[in-house]
């Protein structure tokens, strides 16, 4: 009896139940003490109705078994109230619960007379039958555990239950709708490394893959009758579309079982295939055979399989069925691999755009900061140009070589345009630097500067020093040399004087107007008698009062301090007359030639400065 119980339990034990109701706690454990008895639900037409002990029924006529387990503490003579605890009964065994649900939900069977057989009802014949009735009652109360809707299998098996008999024996009768859903959810799971069959009404499991393949062929394919070669594997993509031959169904079942009998024979290659055609294609990769030639005229390309050839031939026919689905893109390709590469390129571009958008606010903030800094510099320059009354602040910043006493500009704008202060005296008279160090300027009239398009603060410090600097005294030698090396004629009307050695006065603060500019310039030249005596002798057109001071009516030299200039810009130099008759020296850097080459400014004296002033105007 123990052997019969063991064989029936191993043959009929179903898979574990999952997804049960949360109110029923089913721990994954079983009782250490085996169930006291095993009762079977009779399903054969020849068997009698009701429950019968397993000793009275032959083993070959049994179809299903229900292993019922009771708690070891429940005595056989317990009262119905004490043994009616549903929770304790359900916790006793998971397998008994699943088999009870399957037995309760199985469709009625056809008896000998064609009528449906009644369900097995326990009778009070013995104590064991009373315990079985309690278990069946508990299974009925737990019938809500798997209330799944009807799936696709219900449509398939519905007509067989109502009218036509199934094409396989009664021992493989398909379950009802709920059982189909339960089998779909539980079948096919590999428990403890076993290969499970996922046929819709089968719960067999095997240790080896070869056993599963043999089971599918013998139990499910060979038992089919007629021309219906349909795959009833749970979750098959064919959705019960039948094959027209048995061998095709056998080959198709290799997809579900994982069988790959076609193995590569080359050494070092362990690939295997379920279809022989795929193995042949693979062997061509070892042999280099390419039997599929391109059928386009003039094309000699060959391929190992027909699918690659078909992709290639689309390039000749200009047929590109694989189109990009991204909005705004009209690219089309002949094969899906090229389309996948194209889609990856799209994703890469999107990532770059996202990075740019992420870094965009930072870049805009940097640009805004730079613009604000430049705007502040521009504003400060304008304020410096209009700060002083005479407007000499900007001139000192732009021309540090002309103004040796000026402060070095902060932004380095004019540092590369003009030479430093110590370079200017080397090219001019030794007293030029001393004279220019005081930088007393004569402002231009507002009308002149406005007519030229420049502000009084910008034009006056640049043009005025060129026409307002005093003449240097003659050296003590009999002849003075020009920068070109040619001697100047001496003046015989006055003896020579010692060189000027008076120290230069300290630099004056920012000018507060031009009052007293005439006396400041006179203090720079204590030997003005030389100039006053030389002027009438050389010029010959002197006026009254020239020998006693500067004539305000004479448009020359310092006369521009109190008299408006007759012309704007550098044209005023052309209208000035030379007090001394000096030979003109040719120079390429001289801005204007003619009578303006006087003794005060020999040729080339301010050529370096004049050459860079127009560039300053254009830059501003």
Curated annotation (Swiss-Prot):
In terms of InterPro entries, this protein maps to: GLI-like, Znf-C2H2_ZIC1-5/GLI1-3-like, Znf_C2H2_sf, Znf_C2H2_type
**Major localisation:** nucleus
Please report which protein family the annotation says this sequence is part of.
Belongs to the GLI C2H2-type zinc-finger protein family.
- What are the GO cellular component annotations? nucleus
Tell me where the sequence motif Bipartite nuclear localization signal sits in this chain.
340-356
Q: What is this protein called?
A: Zinc finger protein GLIS1
Location within or outside the cell: Nucleus
Keywords in alphabetical order: Activator, Differentiation, DNA-binding, Metal-binding, Nucleus, Repeat, Repressor, Transcription, Transcription regulation, Zinc, Zinc-finger
Ranges of biased composition (kind: Low complexity): 477-488
Compositional bias of kind Pro residues? 489-510
**Subunit structure, as described in the record:** Interacts with KLF4. Interacts with POU5F1 and/or POU5F1B. Interacts with SOX2.
Q: Select a single GO molecular function from the record's annotations and give it.
A: zinc ion binding
Which residue stretches are annotated zinc finger (C2H2-type)? 195-220, 229-256, 262-286, 292-316, 322-346
Q: What does this protein do?
A: Acts both as a repressor and an activator of transcription. Binds to the consensus sequence 5'-GACCACCCAC-3'. By controlling the expression of genes involved in cell differentiation inhibits the lineage commitment of multipotent cells. Prevents, for instance, the differentiation of multipotent mesenchymal cells into adipocyte and osteoblast.
Looking up Pfam families in the UniProt record yields: zf-C2H2, zf-C2H2_15
Q: Mind listing the GO biological process terms from this record?
A: cell differentiation; negative regulation of transcription by RNA polymerase II; positive regulation of transcription by RNA polymerase II; regulation of transcription by RNA polymerase II
Usage in biotechnology: The combined transgenic expression of the OSK transcription factors POU5F1/OCT4, SOX2 and KLF4, reprograms differentiated cells into induced pluripotent stem cells/iSPCs. iPSCs exhibit the morphology and properties of embryonic stem/ES cells. The coexpression of GLIS1 can increase the efficiency of OSK-induced pluripotent stem cells/iPSCs production.
- Name the gene behind this protein: GLIS1
Positions of the UniProt region annotated as Disordered: 108-132, 414-515
């Amino acid at each position: 009896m123990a052997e019969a119980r063991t064989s029936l339990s191993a043959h009929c034990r179903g898979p574990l139940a999952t997804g049960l109701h949360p109110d029923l706690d089913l721990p994954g454990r079983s009782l250490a003490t085996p169930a006291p008895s095993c009762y079977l639900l009779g399903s054969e037409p020849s068997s009698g109705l009701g429950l019968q002990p397993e000793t009275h029924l032959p083993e070959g006529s049994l179809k299903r078994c229900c292993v019922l387990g009771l708690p070891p503490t429940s005595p056989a003579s317990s009262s119905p109230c004490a043994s009616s605890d549903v929770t304790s009964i359900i916790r006793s065994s998971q397998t008994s619960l699943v088999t009870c649900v399957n037995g309760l939900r199985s469709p009625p069977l056809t008896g000998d007379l064609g009528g449906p057989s009644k369900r097995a009802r326990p009778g009070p014949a013995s104590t064991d039958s009373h315990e079985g009735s309690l278990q069946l009652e508990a299974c009925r109360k737990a019938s809500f555990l798997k209330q799944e809707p009807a799936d696709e299998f219900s449509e398939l098996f519905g007509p067989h239950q109502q009218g036509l008999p199934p094409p396989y024996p009664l021992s493989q009768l398909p379950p009802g709708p709920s059982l189909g859903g339960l089998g779909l959810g539980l079948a096919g799971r590999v428990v403890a490394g076993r290969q499970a069959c996922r046929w819709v009404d089968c719960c067999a499991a095997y240790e080896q893959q070869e056993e599963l393949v043999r089971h599918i062929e013998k139990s499910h394919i060979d038992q089919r009758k007629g021309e219906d070669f349909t795959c009833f594997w749970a979750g098959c993509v064919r959705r019960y579309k039948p094959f027209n031959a048995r061998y095709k169904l056998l080959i198709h079942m290799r997809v579900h079982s994982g069988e790959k009998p076609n193995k590569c024979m080359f050494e070092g290659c362990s690939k295997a295939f379920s279809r022989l055609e795929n193995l042949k294609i693979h062997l061509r990769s070892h042999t280099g055979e390419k039997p599929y030639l391109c059928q386009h005229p003039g094309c000699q390309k060959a391929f190992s399989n027909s699918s690659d050839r078909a992709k290639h031939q689309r390039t000749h026919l200009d047929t590109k069925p694989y189109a990009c689905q991204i909005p705004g893109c009209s690219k089309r390709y002949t094969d899906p691999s090229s389309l996948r590469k194209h889609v990856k390129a799209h994703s890469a571009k999107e990532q770059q755009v996202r990075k740019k958008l992420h870094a965009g606010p930072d870049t805009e903030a940097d640009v805004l900061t730079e613009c604000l800094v430049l705007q502040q510099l521009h504003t400060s320059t304008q304020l410096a140009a209009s700060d002083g009354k005479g407007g000499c602040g900007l001139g000192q910043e732009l021309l540090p070589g002309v103004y040796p006493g000026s402060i070095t500009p902060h932004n380095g704008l004019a540092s590369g345009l003009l030479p430093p202060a110590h370079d200017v005296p080397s090219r001019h008279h030794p007293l030029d630097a001393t004279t220019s160090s005081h930088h007393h300027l004569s402002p231009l009239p507002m009308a002149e500067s406005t007519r030229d398009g420049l502000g009084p603060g910008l034009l006056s410090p640049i043009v005025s020093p060129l026409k307002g600097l005093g003449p240097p005294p003659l050296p003590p030698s009999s002849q003075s040399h020009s920068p070109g090396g040619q001697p100047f004629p001496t003046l015989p009307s006055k003896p020579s004087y010692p060189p000027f050695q008076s120290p230069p006065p300290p630099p004056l603060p920012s000018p507060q107007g031009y009052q007293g500019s005439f006396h400041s310039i006179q203090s720079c030249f204590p030997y003005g008698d030389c100039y006053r005596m030389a002027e009438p002798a050389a010029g010959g057109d002197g006026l009254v009062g020239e020998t006693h001071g500067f004539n305000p009516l004479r448009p020359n030299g310092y006369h521009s301090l109190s008299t408006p200039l007759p012309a704007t810009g550098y044209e005023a130099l052309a209208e000035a007359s030379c007090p001394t008759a000096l030979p003109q020296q040719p120079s390429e850097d001289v801005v204007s030639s003619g009578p303006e080459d006087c003794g005060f400014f020999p040729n080339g004296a301010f050529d370096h400065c004049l050459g860079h002033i127009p560039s300053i105007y254009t830059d501003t």
